[in-house]
Design a protein with these regions (language model features):
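Active-site loop of short-chain dehydrogenase/reductase
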Residues: 5-6, 73-74, 119-132, 167-170, ...
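Conserved glycine-rich cofactor-binding loop
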Residues: 14-15
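Substrate-binding pocket helix/loop in short-chain dehydrogenase/reductase
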Residues: 88-89, 96-98, 193
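A short, exposed helix-loop element centered on a Lys and neighboring polar residues
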Residues: 112-113, 159
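Catalytic loop of short-chain dehydrogenase/reductase
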Residues: 128-153, 158-159, 163-167
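C-terminal substrate-recognition "lid" of short-chain dehydrogenase/reductases
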Residues: 171, 204-228, 233
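Short C-terminal tail/terminal secondary-structure segment
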Residues: 222-252
């Protein structure tokens, strides 16, 4: 099918990686439904925007109603919305835990379930989820057990769904990212964050976008957890002495 008739749904689409994904899909002639809690309408008639919290099932209902009403189908879902807080395990609050589960797990569940329902009827589709390589290689300098707990669950769900729907034309993959240079990270933290990767630099938004686009075009790839992390998942490496992350918060 020509990409002129393909439709992508992107969550966490108002900034950072999500906004870059929207533009990448449009550059490939996809029509896009973009959602986040703060997204605003855009002039491009081939982008539908839906403001809402992915943890709310009503948001998923609205997103996929827009996709079908305006564009007739859903070919790709990118579960990009997510949150991250680096802090010691005993410092997490009940509210932190609830917020993590709501955004990272509940949001994934509602969005993916509705997407696959549509893709099943079409006989094809692709779901790709952004996770973290801290699942594979925890770091003493980045205590983030709730990220590992929730994003690790998404890695497991990716493989499970890939097998469940392999013969139904629906592929399910994930991009396991390192720390990506976005506006959420202050410039004074970049040197330390770069040191957390064996390649010695932070990832760029384009690194994740390229990985998503590869997976979207790789028709014989499903159940893949593609690491885009500058070597983090490959093993441990020496980190220069310096200031740690403290209480780092990232929300998509």
């Amino acid at each position: 099918m020509s990409t002129a008739h393909r439709v992508a749904v992107v969550t966490g689409a108002s900034q950072g990686i999500g906004a870059a994904l929207v533009q990448a899909f449009r550059s490939r002639n996809y029509k896009v439904v973009a959602t986040s809690r703060s997204i605003k309408p855009v002039a491009d008639s081939d982008i539908a925007t839906v403001r809402g919290d992915v943890a709310d099932p009503n948001t998923a209902d609205l997103v996929f109603k827009q996709a079908l009403d305006r564009f007739d189908r859903v070919d790709t879902l990118v579960n990009n919305a997510g949150m991250f807080m680096a802090k010691p395990f005993t410092a997490y609050s009940k509210d932190d835990y609830a917020a993590y589960v709501a955004t990272n797990v509940t949001g994934f569940f509602h969005m993916t379930q509705r997407a696959i329902e549509i893709m099943n009827k079409q006989g094809n589709g692709h779901v790709v989820t952004i996770t973290t390589s801290l699942v594979d290689q925890p770091m003493t300098s980045v205590p983030a057990v709730l990220a590992s707990l929730t994003k690790g669950a998404l890695n497991a769900a990716t493989k499970s769904l890939a097998i469940e729907y392999a013969k139904k034309g629906v592929r399910v993959n994930a991009v396991s990212a390192g720390i990506i240079k976005t506006s959420m990270h202050p410039p004074e933290a970049h040197q330390f964050l770069a040191s957390l990767h064996p390649m010695g630099r932070m990832g760029e938004e384009s690194d994740v976008v390229d990985a998503v686009m590869y997976l979207d075009s790789a028709r014989f790839v499903t159940g893949e957890i593609l690491h885009v992390d500058g070597g983090q998942a490959a093993g441990h490496h020496a980190i220069e002495q310096g200031t740690g992350l403290g209480d780092l918060r990232v929300a998509g």
